A protein has these predicted regions:
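Active-site-adjacent structural elements in enzyme catalytic domains
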Residues: 22-26, 33, 37-38, 43, ...
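Structural beta-sheet core signal
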Residues: 28-29, 124, 300
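Extracytoplasmic mature domains of secreted/periplasmic and thylakoid-lumen proteins
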Residues: 85-86, 92-160, 167
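Sec-dependent N-terminal signal peptides
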Residues: 4-14
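A post-motif C-terminal structural segment
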Residues: 24-25, 34-40, 44-86, 135-459
Length: 459
């Protein structure tokens, strides 16, 4: 009998211990396109601003546990964001272009759904469109990531507690307005951070997007104004919403989607600025973790690498500090040049040089050789006399802006493999309850499975 009670007590202790180790609050950060080198280049750049060789640490890169993961899709070595997002959301490989489904088109639920079914509040946010591939992988089931309106319908039907990002890509189709559909499903719309601050306490469920007097798409960090949403504002509002009247905990997916867009454009400084902005939002999760250290898990990873960025292009030294002279994205430079071109009066080379100096620091803070200036002048003639352009997945840029960008990158010591995704490893950084469970080389489908187990979600 005595042995029986001892055994019973040990079982009870084991059960309590297991429960105590569950993560009540889960932050799931995904830097879209943020491979190992995007992190490394950012840290090298920050150190260069201090005039030293080495790295200046990003907070998430100093988490006590770190490893890396593969990102291939079921049908391609180099994945797209839909297949990679589905892997990180559901623990299943699928074909590129598919969302929330296996490769044979069977719908599968996500870790966000498991969390909701387990009584947790759920937040899904990004700094790109809220129906883009990565966020959509956590609530939608579609054979094609381009089915934007059906994806938006499934977002409204998900019942998740908080969404944020840029507004829908295709809000109205066949007379059905997704804004109305979401409102009918109990969501309060907040246009901008100030409006969200005024509404979140009374809202049952909240969707936060850009202010109505600002462009739909949240700008790159380098182009942002004080009226635009920041990643930190998105995360702060999310924490407030998810903690409100909640004793059961939450699952909060945060995507830094603009990193991927900048890498598609092979725009090093714009990429770095968005990695830094991503890090700033993670600091809020770290502050939360410090208040709830025995109940919180933070996972920071990526869906894939974009661009094949490398710190080094031949010489054994870098000049990354030159990048600080870039003041806007290549997309924004293109808009400046297009505005000049719309003015029918012929613009002189000196007019163009002024734009390139203001935008990239070229000619003034970044000295150019005669041959380098000649290369830009040839691009100027091709762009202004003709219509030379460079296209990537998300934008079409002036060939002159692209050439100036490439020149600054090269002088800084940055090289790119392409303007598309690569099959490179992605980082995994963890801190908090169960963080030690992420070890060894991982497959991306392992990450949601490990996370769900640590959090005790019911599938």
């Amino acid at each position: 009998m005595k042995k029986f009670f001892i055994l019973l007590a040990l079982c009870a202790f084991g059960t309590v211990s297991a429960l105590a180790q569950q993560a009540k609050y889960v932050f799931y950060f995904i830097g879209d396109g943020m491979g190992l080198n995007q992190v490394n280049v950012t840290e090298l750049y920050l150190a260069s601003l201090e005039g030293r060789i080495g790295i200046e640490h990003l907070e998430f890169a100093d988490f006590p546990y770190s490893t890396f993961a593969t990102s291939y899709a079921s049908n391609t070595d180099v994945t797209d964001s839909a297949a990679a997002g589905t892997a990180l959301a559901t623990g299943h490989k699928t074909k590129s272009g598919m969302l929330g489904m296996t490769a044979d088109s069977v719908a599968v639920n996500s870790i966000a759904y498991w969390a909701k079914q387990s009584g947790k509040k759920v937040g899904i946010c990004t700094n790109v469109i809220i129906d883009d591939a990565t966020p959509a992988a956590f609530y939608a089931h579609q054979t094609n990531r381009g089915h934007y309106h059906p994806i938006g319908m499934q977002m409204a039907e998900s019942g998740y507690d908080y969404f944020a990002g840029s507004d829908f890509r295709r809000p109205v189709e066949n007379g059905v307005d997704l804004h109305t559909v979401c409102a009918d499903h109990g969501y309060t719309w907040a246009y901008g951070y100030d409006e969200a601050r005024a509404k979140w306490q009374s809202a049952e469920k909240l969707i936060m997007v850009q202010r109505k007097d600002r462009p739909r798409d949240i700008p790159y960090t380098i182009d942002r104004t004080e009226q635009d949403l920041t990643m930190s504002q998105i995360v702060e509002t999310g924490i407030n919403m998810l903690m409100k009247n909640n004793k059961n905990g939450f699952f909060f997916m945060v995507e830094g989607g603009a990193i991927d867009h900048a890498c598609h454009g092979r725009d090093a400084m714009t990429t770095i600025k968005d990695v830094i902005d991503f890090n700033e939002s993670i600091k809020l999760a770290i502050d939360f973790y410090k208040k709830h250290p025995k109940e919180t898990l933070i996972v920071v990873t990526a869906d894939h690498e974009t661009g094949g960025i490398v710190p080094g292009n031949g010489p054994y030294h870098l000049n990354l500090d030159l990048l600080q002279h870039q003041t806007c994205s290549t997309d924004a430079v293109t808009e400046k040049l297009n505005n000049l071109k719309r003015n029918r009066m012929r613009k002189t080379w000196d007019d163009i040089k002024a734009v390139l100096s203001e935008s990239y620091g070229l000619f003034t803070k970044v000295k150019l050789s005669e041959s380098e200036e000649n290369t830009l002048h040839e691009a100027y003639e091709a762009a202004f006399e003709g219509d030379a352009k460079e296209e990537n997945w998300y934008s079409t840029n002036s060939a002159l802006a692209a050439k100036a960008r490439d020149l600054l990158n090269r002088k800084a010591g940055i090289s790119w493999a392409s303007g598309s995704h690569s099959g490179g490893y992605v980082p995994v950084f963890t801190i908090g309850v169960g963080a030690e469970k992420y070890h060894g080389r991982l497959n991306n489908i392992d990450i949601p499975e490990i996370t769900a187990k640590i959090a005790g979600y019911k599938k």
